[in-house]
């Protein structure tokens, strides 16, 4: 059985706008290439392209998914946050939260990103695939119930697991977040 790979180019259309996070260069901090935001679609496109040119792409079971529903999101995030996120994404006039910006289309991209993770989890739990990888963007591992943080807008894995729990009842899983940095992670 091959590895299922969940990807949708539309997830990469999310933009942080002109916001650029800069860190002092030196020590172990490399100068940024250009003025793009640290969390940007090119790193994910590069990963996908490497899979293709290496020939590994041909051994993957490439799949797509539908966006998560608002009902799915509300199992993890608060109604005020979801309302603010949807409004901000529709007009792009505010930057609620701690370390991220929401622009037009952010809600749709984040919902689709979480949808990829939800489908990956559902397919593994149903044993229709043995293992899965979701190339999901924007990421979700730092998002909190009341706010997006750390460039994460929706808590993708939490949304996927709560959706699975709602469908299957009791669910026992382990989540390993391998993200090497200080703070929320």
State where each predicted segment sits.
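HDAC/HDAC-like amidohydrolase catalytic core signature
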Residues: 1-176, 180-185
């Amino acid at each position: 059985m091959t590895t299922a790979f969940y990807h949708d180019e539309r997830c990469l259309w999310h933009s942080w706008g002109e916001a650029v996070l800069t860190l002092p260069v030196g020590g172990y901090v490399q100068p940024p290439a250009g003025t793009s935001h640290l969390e940007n679609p090119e790193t994910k496109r590069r990963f996908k392209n490497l899979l293709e040119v290496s020939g590994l792409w041909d051994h993957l079971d490439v799949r797509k998914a539908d966006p998560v529903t608002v009902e799915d999101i509300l199992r993890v995030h608060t109604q005020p946050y979801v309302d603010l996120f949807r409004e901000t994404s529709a007009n792009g006039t505010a930057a609620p939260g701690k370390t991220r910006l929401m622009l037009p289309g952010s809600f749709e991209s984040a919902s689709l990103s979480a949808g990829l993770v939800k489908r990956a989890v559902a397919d593994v739990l149903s044993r229709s695939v043995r293992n899965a990888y979701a190339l999901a963007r924007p990421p979700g591992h730092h998002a909190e119930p009341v706010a997006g943080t750390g460039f994460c807008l929706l808590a993708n894995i939490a949304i996927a697991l709560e959706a699975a729990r709602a469908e299957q009842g009791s669910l026992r899983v382990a989540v390993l977040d391998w993200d090497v940095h200080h703070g929320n992670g």
